[in-house]
């Protein structure tokens, strides 16, 4: 899988060298895609891992993209997303407002993967007062919307950030993983998100993307949000032969097209499916 990441990274970097605005450049403006896009990495990852290659691809296609590492404890900056959902969501909210202010945009779009996808649902719901209508398109790739098991979360923390098992164990043994406690089935964060009140907030459009072959967020249908106006998408409904699982959804060009379609408000727009790497 890591060689696949490297291959995509080289290709994306080459594309960036020839076109598009810069990444994390607050002077970026795009007439074609006026909303800045904030990307939210998954559990155990950082802003320069997990969604970094998708960020390059979006940038090369004319989007202004922004990302930062959230939820990392002091002393362990290379393993993000471990803090409780509430703490991380506050960091993310502050960053969204920073991007909005510094770019002068009226709206910001969010794209998240795994825990970052869950935050794409969580932040708009629980930070409405601070955001005050700042968000527009929301794209959540494989969120554990109704929770998953700890074994799956542990594997995600290892794989998404290219971390070793011993490295993750050291971090977890030192600072723990409050996000894991929040994200397990019936965890406190999952209960808050599914408190019977709408997840989708007025003024936003949500797309949820999931793979039938996801072995880490299970059951796979747990990702979907069954509320009016939500676009719940199986990757395989568009690309039937795509075998991608949870980790590789971030590196799957078919998913990238579904993301850009969602950001452009053209969910059903056709694209050419490419082969993808299987995996959990």
Label the model's feature ranges.
Residues 41, 65, 89-193:
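Serine-dependent carboxylesterase/thioesterase catalytic core
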Residues 47-51, 81-89, 113, 182-186, ...:
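Solvent-exposed, acidic/flexible segments
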Residues 29-33, 59-60, 102-103, 111, ...:
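Extracellular/periplasmic catalytic domains that process cell-envelope and extracellular macromolecules
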Residues 27-108, 160-170:
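Active-site catalytic motif of lipid deacylating hydrolases and related acyltransferases
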Residues 1-21:
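Fungal secretory targeting signals
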Residues 37, 65-67, 138, 206-208, ...:
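Conserved beta-strand scaffold positions in the cores of enzyme catalytic domains, especially
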Residues 52, 147-154, 218-222, 244-245:
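Short aromatic-enriched loop/helix-cap "lid" or pocket-rim segments at secondary-structure transitions
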Residues 161, 199-280:
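C-terminal catalytic-base region of ester-bond hydrolases, centering on the histidine
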């Amino acid at each position: 899988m890591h060689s696949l990441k490297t291959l995509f990274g080289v290709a994306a970097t080459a594309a960036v060298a020839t076109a598009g605005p810069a990444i994390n450049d607050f002077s970026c403006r795009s007439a074609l895609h006026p909303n800045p896009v904030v990307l939210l990495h998954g559990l155990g990852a950082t802003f320069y891992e997990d969604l970094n290659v998708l960020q390059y691809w979006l940038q090369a296609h004319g989007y202004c993209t922004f990302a930062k590492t959230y939820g990392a404890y002091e002393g362990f900056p290379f393993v993000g997303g471990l803090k409780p959902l509430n703490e991380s969501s506050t960091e993310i909210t502050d960053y969204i407002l920073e991007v909005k202010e510094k770019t002068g945009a009226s709206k910001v779009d969010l794209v998240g993967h795994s825990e970052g996808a869950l935050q794409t649902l969580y932040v708009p719901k629980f930070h409405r007062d601070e955001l005050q209508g700042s968000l527009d398109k929301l794209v959540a790739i494989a969120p554990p919307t109704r929770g998953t098991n700890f074994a799956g979360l542990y594997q995600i923390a290892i794989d998404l950030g290219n971390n070793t098992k011993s490295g993750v164990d050291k971090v977890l043994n030192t600072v723990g993983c409050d996000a894991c406690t929040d994200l397990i089935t019936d965890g406190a964060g999952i209960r808050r998100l599914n408190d019977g009140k709408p997840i989708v907030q007025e003024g936003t459009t949500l797309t949820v993307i999931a793979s039938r072959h996801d072995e880490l967020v299970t059951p796979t249908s747990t990702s979907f949000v069954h509320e009016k106006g939500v676009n719940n998408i199986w990757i395989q409904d568009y690309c039937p032969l795509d075998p991608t699982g949870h980790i590789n959804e971030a590196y799957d060009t078919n998913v990238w097209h579904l993301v850009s379609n969602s950001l452009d408000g053209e969910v059903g727009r056709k694209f050419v499916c490419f082969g993808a790497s299987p995996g959990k």
